[in-house]
Curated annotation (Swiss-Prot):
Protein name stated in the entry: High molecular weight rhoptry protein 2
Record has NAD as a keyword: no
S-S bonds: 50-75, 220-227, 768-828, 848-889, 924-1011
Knockout mutant characteristics: Conditional knockdown reduces parasite growth in mice and in culture. Delayed progression to trophozoite stage. Aberrant morphology at schizont stages. Fewer merozoites.
Species of provenance: Plasmodium berghei (strain Anka)
Keywords noted in UniProt: Cytoplasm, Cytoplasmic vesicle, Disulfide bond, Host cell membrane, Host cytoplasm, Host membrane, Membrane, Signal, Transmembrane, Transmembrane helix, Transport
Subcellular location: Host cell membrane; Parasitophorous vacuole membrane; Host cytoplasm; Cytoplasm
Length: 1354
C-alpha cells in the first residue's frame, strides 16, 4: 500500500488554468521538505541520482518496496538514455522541468533550496554544461514552470506597449519620445502657416520657388498624403498650362489674319489674379458672371478673385446678390473675336490641333470630330479660366461646390466632366502606348540575391537589412513628382503654387502624420513593390487573370471606388502609419522578462512567426508572441471609453493617444468595394472570391502608378496592404456570412460531446494554410534572407488578423464571444500554419508514452479536441494543460502502472484519480456520451411525453455518483434505481477495496472527483439539449423541455457545494458583516410583490385600459428595482447574523472587492473581503451574471466556506492555508490562495507595511509580495452611494494615506506578530491582473434607467 502523503497529491491537484486563482494542494508533513532536499548533491552513480529524484519529489519514504523497485528500474534506464543521447540537453531540460513541475504541485519550499537541488540533479545528468549555464537553465526552468502554474504575470507584455501604462522604463521613454517627436513635427507646420489666424493662412515669407522643393523638407516627409496632393495640383496645372501654350502657338502659326488679334490676349483674362475687373461693364449683358459660388474661407478672396468696381446701381445690386465685392468672371470668346467668320476660323484651327493630338486614338478622335464650334469655345473658355484663376470652372450646382472641389486634381477634372482635357493630358504626358491593358504590366527582379543586395543597410533596431537612406530619399522625391523642376522653370515666381500649397496643407491634422520610421517603411514598401513586385499577390498574375475584353469593366469598378472613397483611403493610410509606430515600439520593448532559453518541445508559439530577433538562436523563445501582437491591437480596439473622432480629417492640433480600429476602417471600405463590384449578399463570400481580381486590380491602382488618369490620386501603400488583407479574410477566410447550417459548429464554442466531424476542421486547416501562405509578401525569398520591411509587414498582418477576431479588449482566446473557428484559425496562423491540435499531438507523441493511459493514434485527436472544447476552445489553455500533461506523464510512467481510460473499472479507478487532468476530462466526456445515449433511449422508450422531470433527476444522479464507465449503462441504471444509496456504497467500497492507495486517500479521491457534465446546471442542460437534438425537432420537444427547465434550478441547487474551507477568528461573529450581493436577489422578490399588488389594484379599479396596464406594470417594476438598489441596499435583511455562522451558511469570495474605483478616495478601507449567505451564493451560481470578484460568471471555485476556529473541518475538506488553522484540524489537505489587484491600482502599493522597504511592481509580478487580510478588511459598511446608481460616480484610482491595503515582502514574513488579532496574521500572496469586468450594479442600473426612459417615451 502507498502511505498517505505528498506523492498521492502529485496528481490530485487540478491545475486550475481556467480559473483566475492559482491554487495548489498539499499534505502537511512533520518534517520540513526543505530539510530533505538540502541533502541532494551532485552524484555519478545512477542509483544515487534516482534516490535524489525521489527526495526531490518528497516521495522517498512513501513508496512500498515493490513500487520503489519498479521506479528505480525505470529511472535508471531513463538516466542511461539521457547520458547516451546526442541531444542530451533537450532530454535533460524536459526531464528536469517534469521534476520541478511535479514538486511544485504538492510541496511548498524555499525557491533557493529548489534551485540548488535542481541544479545538482541537472549536473548529475549532464556534466557538459558550465556552472553559469546550469544556473541560467535552472532559472528558466523555474520560470517556465511558474508560467504553467499561472504564477508568471506574462500579461504585462500586453501592458508594455499601451501608451497609458507606466511600467517598463525603456518603453516609457520610447513612448514619450514618440509623442514628443509627433508634437515637434507638427510645430513645423507653424513655419509655413499662421497658426493664430482663424483659417490656415500661408506666411508671406513662403515663396513659390521654395514650395516647389518642399518634397525635400521635413513637412512633406511628415505629411506624405498632403504633400502628394500639393504636387498633384502643381503637376495638373503645369500640364494644362503646357497644353494652352501649345494651342496658342498652333493658333498663331496657322491664323492667316496676323495682327488682327493678339492671340495671347485673346486667350487670357488678365495677367494678374488680384486686380480690378476689366469686365464689369459687360456683367449684365453678354459676359458670363459667376457670383453664386460657395467657396472656402481658407484663402483670402482678394488674392484670388477680381474686385468689381460698380459703375451704376444695377451692377451694385448684382454684386450684392453675389454676397460680396469679390466675384469671378468668364471670358466670352465669341464676343471678344467679334467677327463670326474669324470666330469659325479660329475654332477650326484649334480643332485641327485637337485632331492632330488625338489621331492615334480612334475613340477620342471620333469624339473630337463631332465637336462643334461652341464645344471648342467652351473647351478653350475653361482652359483660359483655369490658367487665370488656378481652379476649375464649374457652372452647375454651385451651391454644393466648395473650393476643394475646384482645385486641379485628376478626380476633380473627371467630376467636372473635363474628359477631353484628361484625354489630351494622358496622351501628351503619359505615353505613346494607348493600350492601357499593357501599361499595367511591369518588370520585376527575379534574382533574389540581387534583390537583397539592394537592401544593403542594417536597421539598428531589428538588425535586418533595409533600403539605404540615400536610395530611400531619392525614391521618395521621385514618388512625389517627376515634373517639379520643369514646373519651376516654366512658372517661376507665380503665386498659384502658394494657393495649391494652402489647399493641400490646410487640413493638416496632428493625428495623421508619418513619423520618420513610417515614412521610411512607406517608401521601402513602394520601392520593393515597384522593383521586386513584393506584395500579397503578383501584379502580373492579376493582370493575366483579366481578359482584354473585360478590362474596361475592371477599370470602371476601380474608378468608381477610388472616386467615392479617396479621402477614407487616405485616412486609413495615415492611421496605419501610427500602427507601424506601435510595431516599432514593440521591437524596442525589453523582452528579457518574457523569454525562455530552453530547447523544449512544448513551445507556446512556433518559430516561424516569432519576432525575427529571436531567430538567431532558436533555443531562445518569447513566452507569448501573441501577447505582444494583442497589446498592439488593443491600441486600436476599445482602448478607452473615449471615442476617437473617426474620419475627422480637417485641421487639428489635438493629439490622441488612442486610435481608431484600423480593421473597422478597412472593413467599411471592403463593404464599399463589394457593393461597387455589384455582388449580391446571397451568398456574398463565394462571389467575392470568384470576383477577387476586381478588388485586387482596384488595389493595384491605389499602390500606383495608376494608369487610369480619371481616378489618379496619392499612392497609398499602407492602405493597400490593409485593404487587401481584409478583403482576403472577408472573402475567403471568414465564415460569418455563410448560411447557419453550413458552418454551425464552427460558429459556436460548445464543449464536444460526440466526436467532431473532421470535415469542419479540414475546412479550418485549409483556410489557415490559405491565409498563412497569403500573408507572405516575398514569394521567392532567398534562403536565410529576411528584410526589415518583411518583418514589419508580418507583424502588421498578425495585428490585422487579431483585429478581425477580436470582440472586445479581452484576450481573444479568453473571450467567450469569439467563435471557436476564429480562435483556432488565429492560433493556427500564429503557429505558422499548424493547428494547435496538431502541435499538441506532436508534442504528446514525442514526449509521452500515450499507452500509459490507453491512448493511441486512433483516439488521440478525440482526446485533444475534448480537452480543448471544455476550456471554451482556448488554444492558450490547451497548450498549457498539454505541457503539464506531458510533464506529469513522464513521472507517472515511472511510478504508476498503465491503464486504459476507455475501460476504467473499479480496479483501475485509483489510477484514473491520480492521472493528469486531461485524462480525467476525457474520461468524464466518455461518461457524458454514455449519459447522452441513456437519455435518448429513455426518452424514446417513454414516447417523449411520458418522460418526466423525475426521470431526468434519476439520470443525473446516476451519473453524478458514477465514477467508472459501464459496460451496460441501461442495466446498471436499473440497479441504481432499485436502491440508490446501496448502489453508490457498493461502487465506492469496491473502488476502495481494489485501490493500492491508502483507504483515506482513496476516499478523498472518490469524494473530490467531479465531471464537467454533472457539476452545473448549464453543463447538464447542454448535454440534454444535445441528446434531444439527436431525436429530431417537434412540438413534443418544446413541451418536454418546458417542464424540465422550470425544475432544473431546484435540481442543481442542492448539488452545488463549495468544497474549499477558510478558517476565520471567532470574533467574526461579533461584526456587522454585510452581504454585498444580497440586493440583487432580494430586490427581485420585493419588486414582484409590489407589482403584483399594483396589477390587482389597477385591474380592479378600472382606471387603466388592458392595453395600458402591461407598460405601466413594467415601468413600475423597473423603477422599483432601481429604487431598491438606491434606498434599500443597506437594510438589515442584507446583514449576516450569528445564526448564519452557527448553521455554516456563510461563504466568502476568494477575491476581495475588485472594482476599487468605486471606493471613495478618502475611505481608509480600500481592501474589502466580501461575505455572502448561502442563499446569495446559490443565486450567483445559477444566474448568468458577470461578478467582478469571480472575474466573470461565478463557479464554486470562486468561494470558500467560512469556518470559525472553534469548529472542525471534515477529513475530506480542503483547507485554505493560513495561520488560523487549528492544530487538531481533521483535514490534512491544504490549498494556497492568491489575491489579485487590478493593474490600475498597483501604483499605490510602494512600501512594505512591516519594514518600510520599497516595493516594486516587479516584486508583485514575481510573487514576492503578500497582502494582509485582517479583520479590518471585512465588508461592514456600504460603499455605494446615489452617484453609483444614477451613473454620475467618477472612478478613483488613488488610495488615501494609512489605508488598509497593507502589503509586505515575502522575505519579511518572520516579522509578523504572533498574535491572531494582528492585521497581517492572515496573509496571502498578491498578484496583478488586467481583467476588466463591468460593475453589475452599474450595468443593471443603466439597463433599468434605459427601460424606464423607453417606456415613458411611449
Amino acid at each position: 500500500m502507498v502511505k498517505l502523503s505528498g506523492i498521492i497529491l502529485l496528481s490530485l491537484v487540478w491545475l486550475k488554468l481556467n480559473n483566475s486563482y492559482e491554487i495548489r494542494e498539499r499534505i502537511s508533513n512533520k518534517n520540513n521538505p526543505d530539510d530533505d532536499i538540502l541533502k541532494i548533491n551532485v552524484e555519478e552513480d545512477k542509483k544515487k541520482i534516482c534516490n535524489n529524484i525521489l527526495i526531490f519529489l518528497n516521495a522517498d519514504d512513501i513508496l512500498t518496496e515493490n513500487n520503489k523497485y519498479s521506479f528505480m528500474g525505470k529511472c535508471e534506464k531513463l538516466i542511461d538514455d539521457i547520458k547516451n543521447e546526442n541531444n542530451s540537453p533537450d532530454i535533460t531540460n524536459e526531464f528536469a522541468l517534469s521534476l520541478m513541475h511535479m514538486r511544485s504541485k504538492h510541496t511548498i519550499t524555499s525557491s533557493i533550496n529548489n534551485n540548488k537541488a535542481l541544479k545538482n540533479i541537472i549536473i548529475s545528468l549532464d556534466k557538459s554544461m558550465s556552472e553559469p549555464e546550469v544556473i541560467n537553465r535552472v532559472k528558466h526552468i523555474i520560470r517556465f514552470n511558474k508560467y504553467l502554474a499561472g504564477k508568471l504575470s506574462y500579461k504585462n507584455i500586453g501592458e508594455s506597449l499601451v501608451l497609458r501604462v507606466s511600467s517598463h522604463e525603456r518603453m516609457r521613454r520610447s513612448k514619450r519620445e514618440l509623442v514628443r517627436n509627433i508634437l515637434k513635427d507638427f510645430h513645423i507646420y507653424g513655419l509655413y502657416f499662421d497658426l493664430k489666424s482663424e483659417n490656415s493662412t500661408l506666411l508671406k515669407n513662403q515663396e513659390s520657388e521654395s514650395l516647389i522643393n518642399i518634397k525635400n523638407e521635413k513637412l512633406c516627409q511628415t505629411y506624405i498624403h498632403l504633400c502628394q496632393k500639393f504636387y498633384e495640383q502643381t503637376s495638373v496645372y503645369y500640364k494644362i498650362k503646357t497644353i494652352l501654350n501649345e494651342v496658342i502657338k498652333h493658333t498663331k502659326d496657322n491664323y492667316a489674319l496676323e495682327g488682327e488679334y493678339d492671340i495671347s490676349k485673346l486667350f487670357s483674362l488678365e495677367n494678374s489674379i488680384s486686380q480690378v475687373s476689366q469686365h464689369s461693364d459687360h456683367m449684365l449683358t453678354n459676359e458670363s458672371l459667376i457670383y453664386d459660388m460657395n467657396k472656402s474661407n481658407y484663402i483670402k478672396y482678394n488674392q484670388l478673385i477680381h474686385e468689381v468696381i460698380p459703375e451704376d446701381g444695377n451692377i451694385e445690386e448684382q454684386v450684392k446678390k453675389g454676397n460680396g465685392r469679390y466675384i469671378v468672371v468668364v471670358k466670352n470668346l465669341k464676343k471678344a473675336i467679334g467677327n463670326s467668320e474669324n470666330y469659325d476660323n479660329i475654332m477650326n484651327i484649334i480643332k485641327k490641333y485637337l485632331i492632330n493630338v488625338t489621331k492615334n486614338n480612334k475613340e477620342i478622335l471620333d469624339m473630337v470630330m463631332e465637336l462643334g464650334n461652341e464645344d471648342i469655345e467652351q473647351f478653350m473658355t475653361q482652359l483660359v479660366f483655369f490658367i487665370h484663376y488656378g481652379f476649375l470652372l464649374i457652372t452647375e450646382d454651385k451651391h454644393m461646390i466648395y473650393l476643394s472641389d475646384m482645385i486641379p486634381t485628376y478626380t476633380n477634372l473627371y467630376r467636372a466632366n473635363e474628359v477631353l482635357l484628361l484625354h489630351i493630358m494622358d496622351i501628351k504626358f503619359e505615353s505613346d502606348d494607348f493600350n492601357k491593358y499593357e501599361k499595367y504590366k511591369f518588370e520585376t527582379s527575379d534574382n533574389d540575391k540581387e534583390t537583397y543586395s539592394l537592401l544593403n543597410e542594417i536597421d539598428s533596431i531589428t538588425q535586418l537589412p533595409k533600403l539605404s537612406e540615400n536610395v530611400a530619399n531619392d525614391y521618395f522625391s521621385k514618388i512625389m513628382d517627376k515634373d517639379a523642376y520643369t514646373m519651376l522653370t516654366l512658372d517661376k515666381g507665380i503665386n498659384k503654387y502658394q494657393f495649391y500649397f494652402t489647399m493641400a496643407f490646410k487640413d493638416c491634422n496632428i493625428n495623421q502624420n508619418y513619423t520618420p520610421l513610417a515614412k521610411d517603411l512607406w517608401t521601402e514598401l513602394i520601392y520593393t513593390f515597384d522593383n521586386f513586385g513584393w506584395f500579397y499577390f503578383n501584379p502580373n498574375k492579376i493582370m493575366s487573370s483579366i481578359s482584354k475584353s473585360n478590362f474596361i469593366r475592371h477599370v470602371l469598378v476601380s474608378r468608381n471606388f477610388i472616386l467615392k472613397n479617396m479621402e477614407s483611403l487616405i485616412y486609413l493610410d495615415t492611421q496605419i502609419s501610427r500602427l507601424m509606430d506601435m510595431i516599432g515600439l514593440s521591437f524596442l520593448a525589453d523582452k528579457s522578462e518574457y523569454i525562455l532559453d530552453l530547447s523544449l518541445s512544448n513551445y507556446l508559439f512556433l518559430y516561424v512567426n516569432e519576432y525575427h530577433i529571436f531567430k538567431k538562436d532558436e533555443n531562445v523563445k518569447l513566452i507569448h508572441t501573441y501577447d505582444y501582437i494583442d497589446s498592439i491591437a488593443n491600441n486600436y480596439y476599445y482602448f478607452s471609453e473615449k471615442k476617437y473622432p473617426v474620419f475627422k480629417t480637417d485641421y487639428s492640433s489635438k493629439l490622441y493617444t488612442n486610435f481608431p480600429n484600423v480593421y473597422s476602417l478597412a472593413y467599411q471600405l471592403f463593404n464599399e468595394l463589394a457593393i461597387n463590384m455589384n455582388i449580391s449578399n446571397t451568398p456574398l463570400k463565394k462571389k467575392l472570391k470568384n470576383k477577387s481580381n476586381y478588388a485586387y486590380f482596384t488595389i493595384l491602382n491605389l499602390i500606383g502608378p495608376n494608369h487610369d488618369i480619371y481616378s489618379r490620386g496619392p499612392r497609398l501603400i499602407f492602405a493597400a496592404y490593409m485593404l487587401t488583407l481584409v478583403f482576403f479574410i472577408e472573402s475567403q477566410i471568414d465564415i460569418s456570412r455563410y448560411r447557419p447550417n453550413d458552418m454551425y459548429f464552427m460558429k459556436k464554442a460548445m464543449p464536444l460531446l460526440a466526436p467532431i466531424n473532421r470535415d469542419d476542421f479540414n475546412i479550418l486547416k485549409k483556410r489557415c494554410s490559405l491565409l498563412t501562405d497569403f500573408i507572405k509578401i516575398n514569394r521567392n525569398k532567398a534562403k536565410n534572407e529576411h528584410s526589415r520591411v518583411e518583418e514589419y509587414i508580418k507583424i502588421l498582418n498578425l495585428v490585422t488578423i487579431l483585429l478581425w477576431g477580436k470582440e472586445s479588449n479581452k484576450s481573444l482566446y479568453y473571450d467567450n464571444d469569439v467563435s471557436l473557428y476564429k480562435k483556432l484559425l488565429i492560433a493556427c496562423v500564429f503557429n505558422g500554419g499548424i493547428t494547435v491540435q496538431e502541435k499538441v499531438i506532436k508534442s504528446i507523441k514525442r514526449s509521452c508514452n500515450m499507452e500509459q493511459y490507453g491512448l493511441n493514434k486512433s483516439n488521440i485527436e478525440d482526446f485533444v479536441n475534448v480537452n480543448l472544447s471544455v476550456y471554451q476552445w482556448n488554444p492558450d489553455i490547451l497548450e498549457k494543460i498539454a505541457t503539464a500533461f506531458t510533464l506529469t506523464c513522464k513521472v507517472h510512467n515511472m511510478i504508476y502502472e498503465p491503464f486504459d481510460v476507455h475501460k476504467v473499472d473499479a480496479k483501475d479507478y485509483y489510477k484514473l484519480a491520480v492521472a493528469p487532468d486531461m485524462v480525467k476530462t476525457y474520461h468524464c466526456f466518455l461518461l457524458g456520451r454514455q449519459a447522452e445515449r441513456l437519455l435518448e433511449s429513455l426518452i424514446l422508450k417513454k414516447n417523449f411525453v411520458k418522460f418526466k422531470v423525475e426521470d431526468a433527476i434519476d439520470v443525473y444522479e446516476f451519473f453524478y455518483v458514477t465514477r467508472i464507465l459501464s459496460k451496460n449503462p441501461r442495466e446498471d441504471f436499473e440497479l441504481f434505481l432499485k436502491n440508490k444509496k446501496e448502489y453508490q456504497k457498493k461502487q465506492k467500497d469496491e473502488i476502495i477495496k481494489n485501490s493500492k492507495l491508502d483507504e483515506n486517500v482513496t476516499d478523498i479521491l472518490f469524494q473530490n472527483y467531479e465531471c464537467y457534465w454533472f457539476k452545473s446546471y448549464e453543463n447538464f442542460k447542454s448535454l440534454w439539449m444535445h441528446a434531444a437534438s439527436n431525436l429530431g425537432p417537434g412540438a413534443y420537444l418544446r413541451n418536454f423541455f418546458s417542464e424540465i427547465w422550470n425544475n432544473m434550478g431546484t435540481l442543481f441547487k442542492k448539488q452545488s457545494k463549495v468544497r474549499d474551507v477558510e478558517y476565520f477568528n471567532i470574533n467574526l461573529i461579533g461584526g456587522t458583516l454585510i452581504d454585498y450581493y444580497s440586493p440583487l436577489l432580494k430586490s427581485e422578490e420585493h419588486c414582484r410583490n409590489v407589482t403584483q399588488k399594483l396589477f390587482i389594484s389597477m385591474k380592479d379599479s378600472g382606471t387603466k385600459s388592458r392595453i395600458e396596464i402591461p407598460d405601466e406594470i413594467k415601468s413600475k417594476y423597473f423603477q422599483c428595482k432601481l429604487d431598491y438598489y438606491k434606498n434599500n441596499h443597506s437594510d438589515p435583511v442584507h446583514k449576516i447574523y450569528s445564526r448564519d455562522f452557527l448553521e455554516n451558511k456563510v461563504y466568502v469570495f476568494k477575491q476581495p472587492y475588485y472594482l476599487l474605483s468605486n471606493i471613495d478616495d478618502k475611505n481608509k478601507k480600500q481592501l474589502l473581503r466580501l461575505f455572502i449567505t448561502e442563499t446569495t451564493l446559490q443565486y450567483l451560481l445559477l444566474d448568468d451574471i458577470q461578478i467582478p470578484e469571480c472575474l466573470g460568471r461565478c463557479t464554486i471555485e470562486h468561494f470558500n466556506k467560512v469556518l470559525l476556529t472553534t469548529a472542525n473541518a471534515k477529513p475530506h475538506e480542503t483547507i485554505i492555508y493560513n495561520g488560523l488553522i487549528p492544530e487538531n484540524c481533521k483535514s490534512k489537505i491544504r490549498k494556497e490562495m492568491k489575491i489579485f489587484i487590478h493593474s490600475s491600482f498597483v501604483h499605490n502599493l510602494t512600501r512594505d507595511y512591516l519594514t518600510g522597504e520599497l516595493i516594486r511592481t516587479q516584486d508583485i509580478q514575481n510573487g514576492d509580495v503578500h497582502v494582509c487580510m485582517g479583520s479590518d478588511t471585512y465588508y461592514t459598511e456600504n460603499i455605494l452611494t446615489d452617484q453609483h446608481f444614477d451613473l454620475t460616480h467618477k472612478p478613483q484610482f488613488n488610495f488615501p494615506e494609512n489605508n488598509n491595503y497593507r502589503v509586505f515582502l515575502k522575505k519579511n514574513i518572520n516579522k509578523i506578530a504572533k498574535n491572531p488579532e494582528s492585521q497581517c496574521y492572515v496573509h496571502y500572496e498578491l498578484s496583478v491582473l488586467d481583467t476588466d469586468i463591468p460593475d453589475p450594479y452599474r450595468e443593471i442600473g443603466k439597463d433599468l434607467i434605459t427601460n424606464i426612459e423607453l417606456l415613458e417615451s411611449k
